[in-house]
Curated annotation (Swiss-Prot):
This protein is involved in the repair of mismatches in DNA. It is possible that it carries out the mismatch recognition step. This protein has a weak ATPase activity. The gene is mutS. One of its GO terms (molecular function) is ATP-dependent DNA damage sensor activity. Keywords: ATP-binding, DNA damage, DNA repair, DNA-binding, Nucleotide-binding. PANTHER family: DNA MISMATCH REPAIR PROTEIN MSH1, MITOCHONDRIAL, DNA MISMATCH REPAIR PROTEIN MUTS FAMILY MEMBER. SUPFAM superfamilies: DNA repair protein MutS, domain I, DNA repair protein MutS, domain II, DNA repair protein MutS, domain III, P-loop containing nucleoside triphosphate hydrolases. This is DNA mismatch repair protein MutS.
Amino acid sequence: MTSKKLTPMMKQWHQCKEQAGESLLLFRMGDFYEAFYEDAVLLSQHLDLTLTQRQGIPMSGIPVSTINGYIDRLVSKGFKVAVAEQLDEVQDGKGKSEPLSRELQRFITPGTLLSSSLLPEKAHNYIVSINRVGALFGFSCLDFSTGSFLLQEYDNKKDLIDEICRLAPTEILSCDKFYKKHSDVIEQLLQHLKLTLSTYSDWAFEHQFATQKLSAHFKVSSLDGFGLKGLVPAINAAGALLSYLQDKLLLPIEHISIPKTHGNQKYLLVDTASQVNLELLAPLHDPQGKSSLLHVMERTCTPMGGRLLRNTLVSPFYDQKEILLRQDAVEFLLNRSELRKNLRSFLSQVRDLERLTTRVTTSLASPKDVGMLRDSLHASIRVFEVLSPLPLPEFFQGKFIPTIGLASLLDLLSKALLGELPLRISEGNIFSDDYHPDLKRLRYTRENSKEWLWDYQETIRKQTGVKKLKVCYSQALGYYIEVSSDLAPLLPKEFIRRQSRLHAERFTTEKLQEFQDDMLHVSDKLQMLETELFKDLCSRILEQREAILSLSQVIADVDYILSLADLAAEHNYCRPVVDSSDSLAILGGIHPVAQTLLDRGTFIPNDIKMHSTRTRMILITGPNMAGKSTYIRQIALLVIMAQMGSFIPAKSAHIGMIDKIFTRIGAGDNLSKGMSTFMVEMAETANILHNATDRSLVILDEVGRGTSTYDGLAIAQSVVEYLLFTEGKKAKTLFATHYKELTDLEKHCPHVENFHAGVKENGGQPVFLYEILKGHSQRSFGIHVAKLAGFPLCVVSRAQQILRQLEGPEAASRQNQEKVQQLTLF
């Protein structure tokens, strides 16, 4: 259809669609949001809606009353949605030569959700913007639902990718130039994350524009006061992000907080591969399962506390003071079970203060949201009241600032609002009768009109002395007072004559006219009044915005500590000694996840003792299924928990702070990059060798197994030697291996110690002890594991026959020769 033949309404649609770009446009038409052309086809396909046609144009629609649920479904499928609203009211009984006005008013994308069911309650929903200037990558990260705004720079792609994967955004923004030049970065991110890619103009990433955008938003003349001096690529990314949100997506940005630089100097770095291998946030083979460390540790009562726990789990502290402050606070609550019970009771009543405040700031709050804010403030102040009189540890001191402003706000909200509040302002019944003088009168008029008329009739009868006076109603006159003609002269002058009849006179009064006016428009008046009162109340809330956000952080801290204390109490955890020493000593350590999955008392505790001047590397041999991998993962998890400030499942522990944790555990083909299992293994190992330090913890499981025996052994030993003898790379290393030849290293290097997964034989069958014992393993029992896996018995028998041949005298002689060759490598 040419533009000349387009109806006025379709011309509006085309204008909005041009502005919407790649987004799916929902166009308000009366009681429906309609989609046209390709958008209609997509809407029909993905939401199972009927596809129709009008004048050959495909169209599909969604009822206005159900729009939010359908938008959520579209966004969950990766769509960006644009919404064009109808600005005019339909005029009843009047034709219009011009179409109703419409304009594009909002966009919804995966990274800009505010009040969607898709928002994870206890996780951030980030949108990330990336830019590069010279050798530096800059990125800005925003949780639009809370206003949290972070900036950082990196000098290499690996650290950039690891940090973005740690944050797990749902949307990434950059310019075409970046996407084309650094497609490898995007490919790697897409392997780990479910992402929507968004593109914005190159000019928005220019430094002058970005600086001006940020300065204007935060109302400053310089960004140096925010600690951003010299962070050119990060500033470029941040300014472009704000412009994208405000200028392209038409979103409010008033709630976005002053940006913070998100450095890693105070945090234990756990790279992306290690987060996955250690199953910190989700199980490897069951993303919805319960075998992650997060699931085990999660005891938080509030969304803010849950997000803090999740963030700290993937970025534990590398700062002794921060760790000790939290340990002291955990111990304080651990020893007070009744206090913990009371805190849980109050914290469970606190809703998402950050996101509620954002919805108020962006004028998207519902009455129900404000009611939840009121109830959350009340419960939060009760938390303060419970804790404030106590001899608090340092972590809590200074957090419970005077809450006079918030107490006043709470008092206002409590007096203003009814108990149960609606989702929409249009539903009414938001404010208490006493909050505004007109509320009571209008509601009384609406709900008690008959009683009011009867009372008014009796009142004026008494005032006038005319007992036969009646208050009546007609379609033509509305409400009126009727008396017989002979009694009319008895009425006061303020009675206004309306109509004369043959034997009667009809009057009205100002009060009756006011009642009639109220009755005719009472619902509209009530809605208008409550709408204005609600806007005013939200503005009063915003006066305390910063105080509410500070309160939110305090509640998150209390909830985090309470969660760790409850965890320690439930499982009888110990307080580890965490300091700057080179020690890693754990007595009776237990895998925190396995402990919860197995019956109490069935998990076998194990020890570890390492020190940079003594044992720096432990080689662990033994059969599969005997517990090697569980043990080495366990050590890493206990270190992470300890540096979160948590107590840990052990009898005792002394942990010198670790700066980085690396793992090389298992692998799979990466077909998208043309990488075999062995290539993935080698790439991950190379990353460890390049980035490990003397204070790192390295977990290696079967390095070198993906190639021939000689190649694999040579690679494994060279990796061991590199980590043992290279200055600056002498990390504490746990190396699980089937290469028995490596165990001879213990004889030649005092920093290497052999351990094995214990096995006893009973009637020729192995019994796994799940203990890690001193010395190396004598047998692998691989054929027995094959039998347990269901190999045909004939295959098992043949394997045993071949094994006996290989273990004969000639094989033994050959193995001795190989050992001599192996030692020369060392």
